[in-house]
Design a protein with these regions (language model features):
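Histidine-acidic metal/acid-base catalytic patches
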Residues: 1-34, 97, 140-161, 167-249
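N-terminal pre-domain/capping segments
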Residues: 1-87, 94, 249
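Active-site beta-loop-alpha junctions enriched in small/polar residues
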Residues: 10-14, 41-45, 70-76, 106-108, ...
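Hydrophobic residues within beta-strands of alpha/beta enzymes
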Residues: 38-39, 101-103, 128, 187, ...
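Short secondary-structure transition/capping segments
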Residues: 50-53, 80-82, 113-116, 141-143, ...
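Short, electropositive alpha-helical surface patch
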Residues: 56-67, 120-127, 220-221, 236-249
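Active-site acidic/histidine proton-transfer and metal-coordination neighborhood
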Residues: 62-67, 75-158, 168
């Protein structure tokens, strides 16, 4: 079947997901579009849904989908220590039978906490991927420092490469791909176009060829996650269009 295509539930918009009945209600759309899996977003859960992860995991499996789990949290706190909530997020990812947990980098300063991180990951058995976010901590320089430290310490932590986020922090996506591609295990696909004083995310076929070209700089076998807005009267058809596009590109 080739590379795996994941659909990020947030691509449908938080309000749309809420009105549909939560992330579980989006699974038939995602499965019906022919996607391989779903990225579940912790920030889209209400308190009751967060307690119902086993049922969500069962639904994902029944739909024949893979899962990954995204927590809106930084790996490192402002003082450089590991996020104390990381064990909880790893446990939730395990409950979902997720392939990996995704977090942002946060305030990485030195390698001292990495041995503790290794122990946590060994204990949980969960893979961890770190994403470049839209904060200063997600700039290319700190991401390179972290990736180099992981390589030096043989720490099994890889990167999520969010194609569009580099523009939000003033970096070149192409330069980032040049430096980070070997460590990338997951790609958040989205294009970004100027909007007022900033940028907004759009589908890659609604922007210039730069974005699809950028995919060519990244590992061909890395799963691709659809994170640009998915909108329209027939969400299954819209999703299917982009699943097919990203599988072929």
């Amino acid at each position: 079947m080739g590379r795996k295509i994941m659909v990020v539930t947030a691509a449908y918009g938080a309000e749309q997901v809420r009105q549909a009945g939560g992330q579980r209600a989006m699974l038939p759309v995602i499965a019906g579009a022919g996607a391989d899996g779903v990225e579940i977003r912790r920030e889209l859960f209400n308190s009751e849904e967060l307690l119902a992860l086993p049922a969500l995991s069962e639904s994902i499996e029944l739909m024949g989908l893979l899962a990954c789990y995204s927590a809106p949290a930084a790996l490192f706190m402002p003082d450089g220590t590991l996020n104390p909530d990381l064990p909880r997020y790893l446990s939730e990812a395990n409950t979902l039978n997720a392939l990996w947990l995704k977090v942002s980098l946060g305030h990485f300063s030195d390698t001292q906490p990495l041995d503790a991180l290794r122990a946590l990951l060994n204990a949980s058995g969960m893979a961890l991927v770190v994403e470049n976010d839209q904060t200063d901590c997600g700039q290319l320089a700190p991401m390179r420092r972290f990736q180099a430290a992981c390589r030096e310490m043989a720490l099994p932590v890889t990167l999520t490469f969010d194609m569009g986020n580099w523009l939000w922090v003033g970096d070149s996506p192409e330069e980032a791909a040049h430096h980070l591609a070997p460590a990338v295990s997951y790609i958040h696909v989205k294009a970004a176009v100027p909007h007022k004083d900033n940028f907004r995310a759009v589908a890659p076929d609604r922007a210039d060829a730069r974005w699809l070209d950028l995919l060519g700089q990244l590992p061909a076998d890395a799963p691709r996650g659809i994170e640009f807005p998915l909108e329209g009267a027939d969400l299954t058809a819209v999703t299917r269009h982009y699943v097919n596009l990203l599988r072929e590109e």
